[in-house]
């Protein structure tokens, strides 16, 4: 007879699950900051609406699809951070994971957003063609994303 041992996958024993949960929570935190900074500045830089519009155009599902795409993007970034950036960072210097998360957020916004996405969309480097507030808005959003990412990933170790 063959014994098959089953193992329950939980937040505590699965890096993958922990990284996915971290990506979801970090994206939700990003969204909270996004809608707060939109309300404060009046600059309509809603990434979910933009992603939805670029994907399906104007429809009743634009916002929902945009949020799903943004959530999947956040999960993908969490997996990149957890499996690639974090192991590399730990070899360089030992800092709290939440610090690595915030550094990841800064690097991500500079490379992918300021010099990638925004110029490709015609918004200029760092989105300065939209409004002077855009660089700070996007920087704060991504630092919060990285902070929450680091907090959730390091939570298991406590």
Placement of each model-derived feature along the sequence:
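Juxtamembrane/disordered regions of integral membrane proteins
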Residues: 2-158
């Amino acid at each position: 007879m063959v014994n098959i041992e089953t193992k329950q996958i939980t937040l505590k024993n699965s890096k993958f699950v922990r990284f996915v949960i971290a990506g979801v929570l970090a994206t939700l935190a990003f969204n909270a900051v996004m809608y707060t900074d939109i309300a404060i500045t009046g600059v309509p830089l809603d990434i979910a609406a933009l992603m939805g519009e670029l994907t399906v155009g104007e429809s009743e599902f634009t916002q929902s699809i945009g949020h799903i795409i943004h959530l999947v993007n956040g999960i993908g970034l969490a997996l990149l951070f957890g499996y690639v950036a974090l192991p590399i960072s730990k070899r360089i210097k030992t800092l709290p994971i939440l610090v690595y998360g915030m550094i990841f957020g800064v690097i991500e916004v500079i490379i992918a957003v300021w010099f990638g996405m925004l110029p490709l969309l015609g918004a200029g480097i760092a989105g300065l063609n939209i409004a002077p507030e855009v660089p700070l808005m996007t920087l704060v959003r991504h630092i919060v994303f990285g902070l929450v990412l680091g907090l959730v990933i390091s939570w298991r170790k406590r």
